Amino acid sequence: MVGFKATDVPPTATVKFLGAGTAACIADLITFPLDTAKVRLQIQGESQGPVHATASAQYRGVMGTILTMVRTEGPRSLYNGLVAGLQRQMSFASVRIGLYDSVKQFYTKGSEHASIGSRLLAGSTTGALAVAVAQPTDVVKVRFQAQARAGGGRRYQSTVNAYKTIAREEGFRGLWKGTSPNVARNAIVNCAELVTYDLIKDALLKANLMTDDLPCHFTSAFGAGFCTTVIASPVDVVKTRYMNSALGQYSSAGHCALTMLQKEGPRAFYKGFMPSFLRLGSWNVVMFVTYEQLKRALMAACTSREAPF
C-alpha cells in the first residue's frame, strides 16, 4: 500500500470540505506560474483592457511566456495574484470539490450506485454554487495576473487595494464581472474534472487494474485534467477576456465571444491551450493525490483520537 491506508469509516463532509480547500491551495502554490502564463496568452491580441499585459511584450508558448515575464518583470511576476488565488481556492474548491460527494448522494438518494446523470448534476451544482461564493477572488486574481510592470506602474498595489479599487471604479458589479461565463465554465469544468476522475477511478478499480492507491489517483487525475482542458478551454478564454476587459468594452460575455470569433477566428478560443493543459494536468494530479491522502490522514487522526488504545 502506497500512502495512507483507507479507513473503514468514510470521510465526513467536514473532512472533505477542509481537505479539498487545503489540497487545492497546495496545488495552486505549485502550478501558479503556469496559470499566470495561461492568462497572459489568453488575453494576448485584445485591443484594450483595464490591465495592459501585452503592450510591451509578445508571448510565444508556455516557456517563452514564463521566460519573457521573468526577464521583463522579474520572477515574482509569475506569482501575481497568488494571495487572491489562495483565497479563491480555499472558498471555491472547498465548495465545488468538498461538497461534490454529498450533493451526489443527495441526487442518488443515498444509493451507492450513482449514474452518470447524477454525477453530472452534482458537478454542475457544486461548480455553479462555488462561483456564487468566490467570484470576487477570481476577478482580482485574473486582474493581478494580467497586469505587467513593464511600460508603466502597477494598477493594483495589494490584494485589498485591488478589491477596493475595483469596487470604487466599477461598482459592486465589477467584483462580480464575468459571473455568467464563470458559472458556465465551472459547471463544465466540475463535470469534466470530477466526473471524469470518478469514472476513470471506478473503471480502474472495477477492472482490478489498480488498487485504491497513489498510482490510481495519479492516473485518474491526469486523464481528468486532459479531458477538462479540451472541454473547458473556449469558455475559460472568454471568461478571462471578459473579466479583464475595460468598462464598456464588451456588453456581455456573448459579445466578447462573438468579437473574438470575428477578429481572431475560432483558434482564439484555444489560446493558451498548452499552459492550460500543463496547469490543469499538473494541478489535478497534485490536488487529487493530496486530497485523497488528506482525507485518509484526517480520518485516521479522528479515529485514533476516538480510540487511543
UniProtKB/Swiss-Prot annotation:
Key words of the record: Membrane, Mitochondrion, Mitochondrion inner membrane, Repeat, Transmembrane, Transmembrane helix, Transport
Segments in the Mitochondrial matrix topological domain: 41-77, 146-173, 243-268
Entry annotated with the keyword Acyltransferase: no
Membrane topology: Multi-pass membrane protein
Reaction it catalyzes: L-aspartate(out) + phosphate(in) + H(+)(in) = L-aspartate(in) + phosphate(out) + H(+)(out); oxaloacetate(out) + phosphate(in) + H(+)(in) = oxaloacetate(in) + phosphate(out) + H(+)(out); (S)-malate(out) + phosphate(in) + H(+)(in) = (S)-malate(in) + phosphate(out) + H(+)(out); malonate(out) + phosphate(in) + H(+)(in) = malonate(in) + phosphate(out) + H(+)(out)
Predominant place of localization: mitochondrion
InterPro entries in alphabetical order: Mit_carrier (IPR002067), Mito_Metabolite_Transporter (IPR050391), Mitochondrial_sb/sol_carrier (IPR018108), Mt_carrier_dom_sf (IPR023395)
SUPFAM superfamilies on file: Mitochondrial carrier
GO cellular component: mitochondrial inner membrane
Keyword presence, Transmembrane helix: yes
Chain positions covered by the region annotation Important for interaction with long-chain fatty acids: 16-63, 278-285
Solcar repeats, residue ranges: 11-106, 114-203, 212-297
Site (Important for inhibition by GDP): K141, R185
Top-rank taxon, per record: Eukaryota
Any one of the GO BP annotations: mitochondrial fission
Mitochondrial intermembrane side: 1-16, 104-119, 200-217, 295-309
Transmembrane feature ranges: 17-40, 78-103, 120-145, 174-199, 218-242, 269-294
A Pfam match: Mito_carr
Known role: Antiporter that exports dicarboxylate intermediates of the Krebs cycle in exchange for phosphate plus a proton across the inner membrane of mitochondria, a process driven by mitochondrial motive force with an overall impact on glycolysis, glutaminolysis and glutathione-dependent redox balance. Continuous export of oxaloacetate and related four-carbon dicarboxylates from mitochondrial matrix into the cytosol negatively regulates the oxidation of acetyl-CoA substrates via the Krebs cycle lowering the ATP/ADP ratio and reactive oxygen species (ROS) production.
Complex formation: Homotetramer. Adopts an asymmetrical dimer of dimers functional form. Interacts with MICU1 (when methylated); leading to decrease the calcium sensitivity of MICU1.
Similarity section: Belongs to the mitochondrial carrier (TC 2.A.29) family.
UniProt comment concerning the protein's domains: The GDP-binding domain is located within the hydrophilic cavity, with GDP phosphates likely forming salt bridges with the charged residues, Lys-141 and Arg-185. The long-chain fatty acid-binding domain consists of an hydrophobic groove between peripheral transmembrane helices 1 and 6 near the matrix side.
Protein name per UniProt: Dicarboxylate carrier UCP2
UniProt organism field: Pongo abelii (Sumatran orangutan)
Gene field: UCP2
